[in-house]
């Protein structure tokens, strides 16, 4: 009986994935592409691109922000999906 109970607890923890936090690339300008662990409850990563006088700019991070017209936005829901 104890073995069955332990098995059920382990299966529950694995299936619910307690404590999983999303990992997104964060590229904010000239720093380069690194990763960040998103806050609990945040379920999306984003990549936004726009063109300015110096060329195409790319910004990445956690969340899915609102953008101005002319900015291309891609949001996704898996680790490192915004690369």
From Swiss-Prot:
Cite a GO CC annotation.
extracellular region
Q: Which UniProt keywords apply?
A: Acetylcholine receptor inhibiting toxin, Disulfide bond, Ion channel impairing toxin, Neurotoxin, Postsynaptic neurotoxin, Secreted, Signal, Toxin
Gene Ontology MF, one = ion channel regulator activity
- Which tissue types show expression of this protein? Expressed by the venom gland.
Q: Which InterPro entries match?
A: Snake_3FTx, Snake_toxin-like_sf, Snake_toxin_con_site, Toxin_cobra-type
Where does this polypeptide localize? Secreted
Which cysteine pairs are joined by S-S bonds?
24-45, 38-62, 64-75, 76-81
Q: Which top-rank group of organisms is this from?
A: Eukaryota
Leader sequence segment: 1-21
Q: Please state the protein's primary subcellular location.
A: secreted
**Which is a Pfam family this sequence falls into?**
Toxin_cobra-type
Q: Does the keyword Chloroplast apply?
A: no
Q: State the family it belongs to.
A: Belongs to the three-finger toxin family. Short-chain subfamily. Type I alpha-neurotoxin sub-subfamily.
Q: What does this protein do?
A: Binds to muscle nicotinic acetylcholine receptor (nAChR) and inhibits acetylcholine from binding to the receptor, thereby impairing neuromuscular transmission.
Name the chain's protein: Three-finger toxin MALT0058C
**Organism annotation:** Micrurus altirostris
